[in-house]
């Protein structure tokens, strides 16, 4: 395979945890970031252009996450002592940052897949996955961004990665309620307790089993019961005003809902058109009561994952 002068990769956003699948499940959704690479003449340097989300503050130097992923894959292909060529990197971002929709995972996966595509790379997706985990340690976002669908993952006792992917039917719509207030992953992590009660662990374990079956069997009632949590949501929901009450009322309306990733967004799964109005009204009401604006994304599952779209 020869090197290419120009590549463009599409990578989906993700919603991790889905309630009971804390740190082990995630789903890819059809909101996309795009990474374009173009090789430049030697001496041109690295040029990074950012469009869309984060354009005002995303790093445009070698600290950029996409560049770090590109550099890592290049060294994996050619060796650690080889100089990385000069590049023009264009990022078109649609995934909101710091909202629990996998923006960091999308950046790293996009950079890695684009580099493998450009630089004569024959690394498998599994090999790329291991590489990107060194930059982004959350497999629950990385795996669905790379492969698409619903992914379930674990780390074996021998410290090996293991995961499986389930294609998700596209009948169900996801409404993502995105409050206009950031929540860093670090702050969301710090809110978690050091120990959990045995009953809370059992609560999640029983629902995580059913959560996978609910998606496989298109069982909406089962999804409502299983998309629930006692390990992280009770603590994180208190970090954003109105979030706790909103989650309770959406679920109380019979709609499966969970904090997306570390938050602060909420992922709701709809089976009927009428439910969309309920979710939007509740989202506006609960956040506006605290002076927080909210945005809504109507999405569907993405079963393809990251892929080249320039041939």
Curated annotation (Swiss-Prot):
It catalyses: L-homoserine + ATP = O-phospho-L-homoserine + ADP + H(+). InterPro entries: GHMP_kinase_C_dom, GHMP_kinase_C_sf, GHMP_kinase_N_dom, GHMP_knse_ATP-bd_CS, Homoserine_kinase, Ribosomal_Su5_D2-typ_SF, Ribsml_uS5_D2-typ_fold_subgr. One of its GO terms (cellular component) is cytoplasm. Its main location: cytoplasm. Catalyzes the ATP-dependent phosphorylation of L-homoserine to L-homoserine phosphate. Pathway: Amino-acid biosynthesis; L-threonine biosynthesis; L-threonine from L-aspartate: step 4/5. The gene is thrB. The keyword Ubl conjugation does not apply. This is Homoserine kinase. Keywords: Amino-acid biosynthesis, ATP-binding, Cytoplasm, Kinase, Nucleotide-binding, Threonine biosynthesis, Transferase. Gene3D superfamilies: 3.30.230.10, GHMP kinase, C-terminal domain. Its EC number is 2.7.1.39. It is found in: Cytoplasm. Belongs to the GHMP kinase family. Homoserine kinase subfamily. Pfam families: GHMP_kinases_C, GHMP_kinases_N. The keyword Disulfide bond does not apply. ATP binds at residues 96-106. It is an enzyme of class 2 (transferase). One of its GO terms (molecular function) is homoserine kinase activity. GO terms for biological process: threonine biosynthetic process.
